């Protein structure tokens, strides 16, 4: 639990740092590439390939590709379509995806999640009822893509950890996770990146360094370790604890002119889901 609480406090600043200093200024594919590269470099010196079998290494790489590589691609693009508070609020549905994946894994169906989806859309509409356009709904869907990838990564990591020895030194194998993410981030930048929109200030490079080395490197290792030490219910709660933490940071420091009333009303409807 302590891992999850600590990472929640750490990640509460990430949304605003991306939205304020990087979105629309630094190419999103490049930002993802730098972030993943720095995180990978944190763990490469500790990597011991002999600790995992081939299929286990591939599984950890696949989880990194989904939970980090693909998720970040969705996540960074969402800031081009939505405000920071909106991105934060729309991440509230990750626990729903975790539950749905759990249902799928155990061949169950829980109808209440259909009601949850309807309430989610209503809550989103309240937040932007006076300015809804195709870009807004696209942004909403992009965030859901990120949420789904993050959920798949967490569920998959828990399953993988359950099949590995409890004494495994995870810091000696976690580099595979970031290598998998790199296999998505590098081709994405080479194919779609804009080399004319690289960081132009020391502040932007500093933000990328912090996000890569600390928020991604330390953060994802600690979060995934924490996910293996709690039950699914606690993990779901902690997924949503990031929402109020990130909102407080954004509204207090960077976004004091936001329409707090609409945000609270929309959040209440989504919270009811």
What residue spans do the PLM features occupy?
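Loop-to-transmembrane-helix transition segments
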Residues: 1-7, 48-75, 138-146, 198-218, ...
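Transmembrane alpha-helical segments that form core, pore/gating elements
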Residues: 19, 40-43, 98-99, 132-193
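Specific alpha-helical transmembrane segments that line the substrate/conduction pathway
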Residues: 30-40, 76-108, 114, 146, ...
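Helix-helix packing/entry segments at the starts of transmembrane helices
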Residues: 33, 87-93, 157-182, 213-252
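Hydrophobic/aromatic residues within transmembrane alpha-helices
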Residues: 21, 31, 78, 104-109, ...
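Specific transmembrane alpha-helical segments of multi-pass solute transporters/efflux pumps
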Residues: 10, 14-15, 44-86, 91, ...
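Hydrophobic transmembrane alpha-helices of multi-pass small-molecule transport proteins
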Residues: 43, 93, 109-129, 240-241, ...
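Membrane-interface helix-cap regions at the ends of transmembrane helices
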Residues: 13, 17-20, 38-54, 121-135, ...
């Amino acid at each position: 639990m302590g891992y999850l609480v600590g990472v929640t406090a750490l990640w509460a600043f990430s949304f605003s740092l991306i939205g304020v200093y990087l979105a629309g200024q630094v190419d999103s594919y490049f930002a993802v590439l730098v972030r993943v590269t720095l995180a990978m470099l944190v763990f490469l010196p500790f990597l011991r390939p002999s600790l995992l079998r081939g299929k286990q290494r591939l599984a950890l790489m696949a989880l990194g590709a989904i939970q980090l590589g693909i998720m970040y691609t969705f996540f960074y693009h969402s800031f081009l379509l939505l405000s920071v508070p909106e991105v934060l609020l729309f991440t509230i549905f990750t626990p729903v995806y975790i539950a749905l994946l759990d249902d799928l894994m155990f061949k169950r169906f829980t109808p209440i999640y259909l009601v949850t989806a309807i309430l989610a859309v209503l809550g989103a509409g309240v937040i932007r009822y006076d300015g809804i356009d195709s870009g807004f709904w696209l942004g909403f869907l992009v965030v859901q893509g990120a949420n789904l990838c993050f959920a798949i990564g967490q569920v998959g990591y828990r399953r993988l950890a359950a099949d590995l020895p409890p004494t495994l030194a995870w810091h000696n194998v976690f580099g595979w996770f970031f290598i998998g993410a790199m296999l998505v981030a590098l081709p994405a930048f080479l194919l779609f990146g804009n080399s004319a929109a690289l960081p132009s200030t020391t502040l932007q490079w500093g933000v990328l360094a912090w996000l890569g080395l600390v928020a991604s490197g330390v953060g994802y290792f600690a979060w995934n370790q924490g996910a293996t030490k709690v039950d699914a219910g606690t993990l779901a709660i902690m997924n949503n604890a990031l929402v109020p933490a990130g909102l407080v940071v954004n509204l207090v420091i960077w976004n004091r002119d936001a329409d707090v009333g609409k945000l609270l009303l929309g959040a209440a409807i989504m919270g009811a889901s």
